[in-house]
UniProtKB/Swiss-Prot annotation:
Gene Ontology biological process terms in this record: defense response
Classification via InterPro entries: Cyclotide, Cyclotide_bracelet_CS, Cyclotide_sf
Pfam families: Cyclotide
Tissue: Expressed in leaves, petals, petioles, and runners but not in roots (at protein level).
Protein name: Cycloviolacin-O3
UniProt keywords, alphabetically: Disulfide bond, Knottin, Plant defense
Covalent cross-link Cyclopeptide (Gly-Asn), where: 1-30
Domain remark text: The presence of a 'disulfide through disulfide knot' structurally defines this protein as a knottin.
Domain of life: Eukaryota
Family under the similarity heading: Belongs to the cyclotide family. Bracelet subfamily.
Length: 30
């Protein structure tokens, strides 16, 4: 539920390396 400061509209979350995932076009962590 914490925004990772990255969008995932066009590309996947690079922050997935630290546990972030794409939700509603924005990368979130928990």
């Amino acid at each position: 539920g914490i925004p990772c400061g990255e969008s995932c509209v066009w590309i996947p979350c690079l922050t997935s390396a630290i546990g972030c995932s794409c939700k509603s076009k924005v990368c979130y962590r928990n």
